[in-house]
């Protein structure tokens, strides 16, 4: 039933043709079951394991690697002279692909749990009244249908969306925090809410499915079941939300596509260039064998071009980032989101508990100082402290005072304790104080403990004992006999108390009362001034209300309660405690004591975090279910708005936002800083508008209602104290629910992205070097310098360790003073690509040069001519050109070892270069990152292991090198440092706006030094 909240009880009953005393007949139940279906949320239709596994292989780079593995395996099967070593390459490639697939499947499985977590809010049983049986009967909740008359009482979980028709207790309170985020339980009533557009918070006559009864007993008619409930609509919205890839994932996908196209072109080119060599004598004159040989080289090229270690290094770097974030109370559930935090441009933050402490606290109060006729003055106190721990100072005009010196405060403290059903409790695990009961009542308990009006000695007491000693003292003086519960009509509650011993308040019973100032003052005839009782005139009442209104508006927007006492209350025997409508007549002839103003105070560190966000170019939007005035007041206190800033066009209520056209809503989202009185649908809509403007949004939330928006936003941030559904839908969980932890996580995300750029640059330049080396050997007709299994070793192990260590680079000092990078900013800019090509080109040439040096110049080598080397495949055919040369020399492992050693050494030096994108090694030396030095040492150690351990040297087809050969390796390797220093020098000068000609002078000079080193070096 739509708009059930706006219909009267009779209209709802007639709509379902139901008698509130007898319930539905069995025929009606069957009819409605057929019409509306079962009262349950359908299970999520998840993907099968095989679907998830196959999805992991739906990537161009992965497909190319898989194809390379299959081809290598097939070629190894048909190879005549190869042993088990031939299968190492396809086996290692498959191992990499399987490992990546396992990680991918695990992450997807993790993400699917959000919708399933909703089912925990479905109750198993419900209490209904039906025509087949008299009285209340328990049935399975899934069998409940719209029109059923349901009864609920304290502790029950609401089985469906229910329209209240009758309340049996004084009041009925519902804890609907999971759905609306309201921290205080809500009092419900049976009256119609005439607004058809009312938000869930304003539907005071509806009990929502999955929420809990905090107090009272009532009966209602079911108006929505299954997917037609408020929680069901959230489930529908979540299932319709598509997963969006993070900016990094999108860039890596684009990079993969570009790389795969380049790989395909180069592989075809290498194969085509060598068509003329297919029938060389080395292939036995067989054109097919020659074609297969060069096909193997093309496969090796594909393996060389793909950075197999990149996924593992990225995962490791992100995992390290999550550990650092966890230390800052930000627990990351989805690894890719770590990097996304770095480009967050908008943070949409909940107010309650994130920007504020979610611990109501009395900050101001006033009592009468004097009354002379209609002339009067107030004493106004301020109270410090923003948590439930009763530590804080009571000040008057900035000076600390003793509450014991003010007799009125004796009575005020007593009312706070005795007219109260709540308490504070010390959580031994978390080492914090928590509320037991209502937030507003807990604030009064804490106030009384801070006041300590009876000067109770607290020295030597532990934290728990010192926090309850005032309460214990007051409870030795007074005994609570009964409570007149809060009701909507009088907006107050009171406690009938009798004295246990003589006190300044008198020897007779008292009725201590608290409530809305307007309602309490109506029933006040006197006011307390010190220990005297003075008549309260209408003029004085107006003055109290005026000051109360000042507390409730402006910068503070405090929630005010008036405290009063009935000095001579009616006798209990004359009261009818079962009829709440008569409570109003018992709370009469009250004496006004004072007014306390409380608020959910902002966290101390939030204001500084807002300033940091502004400096970092991040817009903070506060989204809350609170009313507009309260929300704006808090926003002014924390710096989202200036003290006197006009909020027109920057602050919208949910209703105001709905009244705008689509284009106006989009415009509002582009400049707004506050949305108040919002529903879950508003949050999702705001995220959609921000995404359409290419903003990267982080959205916070804690309730079930927040889950769709958390899932839709690029970064969903759930509160540690939030619901399981919110945590499952989010990418990150704040252990301390603190906004400042989000800012710390954003800073970490930016640092991680900078480090990722460095190791991606490092790995890609290495791969370009490998491609260049294979391309050169194939194009020039040189013997193989590197084979696939060696390339895999370099890509995965030798390069992987320093690349991972680059993730430990310290963040730049100015990282939070730069604007967020754009989501569509390329991973590789034009200048970076040129640097990759320059470094990669040198790596490839040096690698091939190392192998060629052994053939042409080494004392232990054959000392061939360049022509002989480039025509080595003709050696087996004989001829004068190869007279006296043993053709087996072309299978010697020395040249491959030289090439591999040059490649590894250059890559270690290149890792050193990657410490900073533009800073020289003189400014940022290697010991800035001790992990990098350790990883370089380990990589060299592993390289020596495969060279000097016989079993491994056979697998990798390498051999030990002598001192002269190692000296040559260093000669080929060291220039890469000089080359990168030149490129960094140019980058710095260009970014500083220096003259291009000056740059060219420096560049020419540096290149001259470089070539002099190559030609005349040792």
UniProtKB/Swiss-Prot annotation:
The keyword Cell inner membrane does not apply. One of its GO terms (molecular function) is P-type calcium transporter activity. The keyword Translocase applies. Gene3D superfamilies: Calcium-transporting ATPase, cytoplasmic domain N, Calcium-transporting ATPase, cytoplasmic transduction domain A, Calcium-transporting ATPase, transmembrane domain, HAD superfamily/HAD-like. Residues 70-88, 273-294, 777-786, 851-896, 949-963 are lumenal. Residues 1-48, 110-252, 313-756, 808-827, 917-929, 985-1018 are cytoplasmic. The chain crosses the membrane at residues 49-69, 89-109, 253-272, 295-312, 757-776, 787-807, 828-850, 897-916, 930-948, 964-984. Mg(2+) binds at residues 702, 706. Keywords: ATP-binding, Calcium, Calcium transport, Endoplasmic reticulum, Ion transport, Magnesium, Membrane, Metal-binding, Nucleotide-binding, Phosphoprotein, Sarcoplasmic reticulum, Translocase, Transmembrane, Transmembrane helix, Transport. Ca(2+) 1 binds at residues 767, 770, 798-799, 907. Its EC number is 7.2.2.10. It comes from the Eukaryota. Ca(2+) 2 binds at residues 303-304, 306, 308, 795, 799. NCBIfam families: ATPase-IIA1_Ca, ATPase_P-type. This is Calcium-transporting ATPase sarcoplasmic/endoplasmic reticulum type. It comes from Anopheles gambiae (African malaria mosquito).
């Amino acid at each position: 039933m739509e708009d059930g909240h706006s219909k009267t009880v009779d209209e709802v009953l007639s709509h379902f043709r139901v008698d509130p005393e007898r319930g539905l007949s069995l025929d009606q139940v069957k009819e409605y079951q057929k019409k509306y279906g079962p009262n349950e949320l359908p299970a999520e239709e998840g993907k099968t394991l095989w679907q998830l596994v196959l999805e992991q292989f739906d990537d161009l780079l992965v497909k190319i690697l898989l194809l390379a593995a299959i081809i290598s395996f097939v070629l190894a099967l048909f190879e005549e002279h190869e042993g088990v070593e031939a299968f190492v390459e396809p086996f290692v490639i498959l191992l990499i692909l399987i490992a990546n697939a396992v990680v991918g499947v695990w992450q997807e499985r993790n993400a699917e749990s959000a919708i399933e977590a909703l089912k925990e809010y479905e109750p198993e049983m419900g209490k209904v009244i039906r025509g087949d049986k008299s009285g209340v009967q328990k049935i399975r909740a899934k069998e409940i249908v719209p029109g059923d008359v349901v009864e609920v009482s304290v502790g029950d979980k609401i089985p469906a969306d229910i329209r209240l028709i009758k309340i049996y207790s004084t009041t009925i309170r519902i804890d609907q925090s999971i759905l609306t985020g309201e921290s205080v339980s809500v009092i419900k009533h049976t009256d119609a809410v005439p607004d058809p557009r009312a938000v869930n918070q304003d539907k005071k006559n509806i009990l929502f499915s999955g929420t809990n009864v905090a107090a009272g007993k009532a009966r209602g008619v079911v108006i929505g079941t299954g997917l037609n409930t408020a929680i069901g609509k959230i489930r529908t919205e979540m299932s319709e939300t598509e997963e969006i890839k993070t900016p990094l994932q999108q860039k890596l996908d684009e990079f993969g596509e570009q790389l795969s196209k380049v790989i395909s072109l180069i592989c075809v080119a290498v194969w085509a260039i060598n068509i003329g060599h297919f029938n060389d004598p080395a292939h036995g004159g067989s054109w097919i064998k020659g074609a297969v040989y060069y096909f193997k080289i093309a496969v090796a090229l594909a393996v060389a071009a793909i950075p197999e270690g990149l996924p593992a290094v990225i995962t490791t770097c992100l995992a390290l980032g999550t550990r650092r974030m966890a230390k800052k109370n930000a627990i990351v559930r989805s690894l890719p989101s770590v990097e996304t935090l770095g480009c967050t441009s908008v943070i949409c933050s909940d107010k309650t508990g994130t920007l504020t402490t979610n611990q109501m606290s009395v900050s101001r109060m006033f009592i009468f100082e004097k009354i002379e006729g209609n002339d009067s003055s107030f004493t106004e106190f301020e109270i410090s402290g923003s948590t439930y721990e009763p530590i804080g100072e009571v000040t008057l005009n900035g000076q600390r005072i003793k509450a014991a010196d003010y007799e009125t405060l004796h009575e005020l403290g007593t009312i706070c304790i005795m007219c109260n059903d709540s308490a504070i409790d010390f959580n031994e695990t978390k080492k914090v104080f928590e509320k037991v009961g209502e937030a507003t009542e807990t604030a009064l308990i804490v106030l009384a403990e801070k006041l300590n009006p009876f000067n109770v000695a607290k020295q030597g007491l532990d934290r728990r004992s010192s926090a309850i000693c005032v309460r214990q003292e007051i409870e030795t003086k007074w005994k609570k006999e009964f409570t007149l519960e809060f009701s909507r009509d009088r907006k107050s509650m009171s406690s009938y108390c009798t004295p246990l011993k003589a006190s300044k308040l008198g020897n007779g019973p008292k009725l201590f009362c608290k409530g809305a100032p307007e309602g309490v003052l109506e029933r006040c005839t006197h006011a307390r001034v010190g220990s005297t009782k003075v008549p309260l005139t209408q003029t004085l009442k107006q003055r109290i209300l005026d000051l109360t209104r000042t507390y409730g508006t402006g910068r503070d927007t405090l929630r005010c309660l008036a405290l009063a006492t009935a000095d001579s209350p009616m006798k209990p025997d004359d009261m009818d405690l079962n009829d709440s409508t008569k409570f109003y007549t018992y709370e009469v002839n009250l004496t006004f004591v004072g007014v306390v103003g409380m608020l959910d105070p902002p966290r101390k560190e939030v204001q500084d975090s807002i300033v940091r966000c502004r400096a970092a170019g991040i817009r903070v939007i506060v989204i809350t279910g609170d009313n507009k005035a309260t929300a704006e007041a808090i926003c002014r206190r924390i710096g989202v708005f200036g003290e006197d800033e006009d909020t027109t066009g920057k602050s919208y209520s949910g209703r105001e936002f709905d009244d705008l056209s689509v284009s106006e809503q989009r415009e509002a989202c582009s400049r707004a800083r506050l949305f108040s009185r919002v529903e879950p649908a508003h949050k999702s809509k705001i995220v959609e508008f921000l995404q359409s403007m290419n903003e990267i949004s982080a959205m916070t939330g804690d309730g079930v209602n927040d889950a769709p928006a958390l899932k839709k936003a690029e970064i969903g941030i759930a509160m540690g104290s939030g619901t399981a559904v919110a945590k499952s839908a989010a990418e990150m969980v704040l252990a301390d629910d603190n906004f400042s932890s989000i800012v710390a996580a954003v800073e970490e995300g930016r640092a991680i992205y900078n480090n990722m750029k460095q190791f991606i640059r490092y790995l890609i330049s290495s791969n370009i070097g490998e491609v260049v080396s294979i391309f050169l050997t194939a194009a020039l007709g040189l013997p193989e310098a590197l084979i696939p299994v060696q390339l895999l070793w370099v890509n995965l192990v030798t390069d992987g360790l320093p690349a991972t260590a680059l993730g430990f680079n310290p963040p730049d000092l100015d990282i939070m003073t730069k604007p967020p990078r754009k989501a569509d900013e390329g991973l590789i800019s034009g200048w970076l690509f040129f640097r990759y090509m320059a470094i990669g080109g040198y790596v490839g040439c040096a690698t091939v040069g190392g192998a060629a040096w052994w053939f042409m110049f080494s004392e232990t080598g054959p000392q061939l001519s360049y022509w002989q080397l480039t025509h080595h495949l003709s050696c087996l055919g004989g001829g004068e050109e190869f007279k006296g040369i043993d053709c087996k020399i072309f299978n010697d492992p020395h040249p491959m070892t030289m090439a591999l050693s040059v490649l590894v050494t250059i890559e270690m030096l290149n890792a050193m270069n990657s410490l900073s994108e533009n800073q020289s090694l003189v400014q940022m030396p290697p010991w800035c990152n001790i992990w990098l030095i350790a990883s370089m040492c380990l990589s060299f150690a592993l390289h020596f292991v495969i060279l000097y351990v016989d079993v491994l040297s056979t697998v990798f087809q390498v051999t030990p090198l002598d001192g002269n050969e190692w000296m040559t390796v260093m000669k080929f390797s060291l220039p890469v440092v000089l080359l990168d220093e030149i490129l960094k020098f140019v980058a710095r000068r260009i970014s500083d706006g220096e003259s291009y000609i000056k740059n060219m002078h420096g560049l020419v000079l540096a290149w001259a030094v470089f070539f002099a080193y190559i030609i005349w070096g040792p």
